[in-house]
Design a protein with these regions (language model features):
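Intrinsically disordered, low-complexity coil segments
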Residues: 70, 210-213
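C-terminal accessory module of base-excision DNA glycosylases/AP lyases that mediates lesion recognition
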Residues: 2-93, 99, 176-203, 221, ...
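Alpha-helical ds-nucleic-acid-binding substructure associated with the helix-hairpin-helix region
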Residues: 128-211
């Protein structure tokens, strides 16, 4: 299971070259999910969800460019973008992912070192910590623990997504112990399962979690998909991804509007439409991009629908 994500049963497509992957998707397609976002768009009319999807992409990218160029806020006339928090259109522009990619880049030519660095980075996922550490710090577990606990701004790790315990050889490893003590000793296990995945992120995630037994394996998923930045020959950027509970309501709207059979087909269609709706796009969208941008569109239209409010952590504050 990836972050409690809903898997769809995708029949008669070419993605089922891997029987393990098929069995995984089929098993989770039948699981009843308790999705807190399921009804967030109920009653809201979205005339053209495809056009709205690409509007969000272009407007959010324009905001990022203006902000990085030092222009004064609000950077947009859209009141929802002025008040709400959103990720960037391209995930490599978000500060967390940017820190992960910069931290791991020096070892991109060594697959074992890259896997170690990425697993540590996604278990940490804290920009300020990753920006201060070096890859050589990962080689000494006791020294690394001291660095994280006593010499870094606290908290040393981010709560952007939950990181639950890892189980290995009868021992439960909490977040700190997993990324400092365990991972350096199981690189061959991680490498073997990633190579056995046939470049598929879901297959690799599930192979690893058969042993880890994490109740929420989203950190594994994020780590494996990040491999595609550096080694697309190992994990394909075009690898199909499961539908997250946050993305499901908007992907449902897109699927219905496009009259397609499932989210996988919907994501493929959205990728094919980007040249029509955004000819100047700086790079090709991938399945994971479309999935998470659909989640951001669900957030955007939840504000419009009054099911999400501009308060607390949802409220954008200019100088943060």
């Amino acid at each position: 299971m990836v972050n409690g994500l809903q898997y769809e049963k995708l029949e008669n497509t070419d993605i089922f070259y891997n029987r393990f992957f098929f069995a995984t998707l089929q098993r989770y397609s039948n699981k009843i999910m308790n999705n807190p976002y399921e009804k967030t768009l109920d009653g809201l009319i979205i005339d053209d969800p495809v056009k709205s999807f690409f509007y969000w992409c272009k407007e959010r990218e324009n905001i990022r460019i203006k902000r990085e160029n030092g222009e004064k806020p609000p950077w947009t006339s859209d009141p929802i973008f002025q008040q709400g928090r959103f990720l960037n259109t391209f995930r490599e522009d978000d500060k967390g992912s940017k820190a992960v990619l910069q931290f791991c880049d020096p070892v991109k030519s060594s697959l074992k070192e890259l896997i170690h660095a990425l697993f540590f980075a996604r278990w940490c996922n804290q920009q300020t910590t990753l920006n201060r550490l070096t890859l050589s710090d990962l080689k000494n577990p006791s020294s690394l623990k001291d660095l994280l606990l006593n010499q870094m701004d606290q908290p040393w790790s981010s709560e952007a997504y939950p990181v639950v315990p890892v189980h290995w050889d009868g021992i439960k490893y909490e977040r700190l112990e997993a990324c400092t003590e365990l991972f350096p000793n199981i690189i061959n296990f991680l490498l073997d399962n990633i190579l056995a995945s046939n470049r598929n992120v879901v297959t690799a995630t599930n192979l690893i979690n058969q042993t880890f037994q994490m109740t929420n394996d989203f950190p594994i998923f994020m780590t494996v998909i990040d491999i595609s930045w550096f080694r697309p020959d190992i994990i394909s950027p075009e690898s199909p991804v499961p539908t997250g509970i946050g993305a499901k309501p908007y992907l449902d709207r897109l699927q219905n509007h496009l009259d397609l059979e499932n989210h996988h087909a919907t994501i493929k269609k959205m990728i094919s439409l980007q040249g029509e709706y955004w000819p100047s796009i700086r790079r090709q969208l991938t399945p994971v991009d479309v999935e998470y941008i659909s989640c951001e569109n669900r957030k955007y239209f939840s504000y419009k629908n009054g099911t999400k409010l501009f308060e607390g952590k949802n409220l954008f504050i200019t100088n943060e």
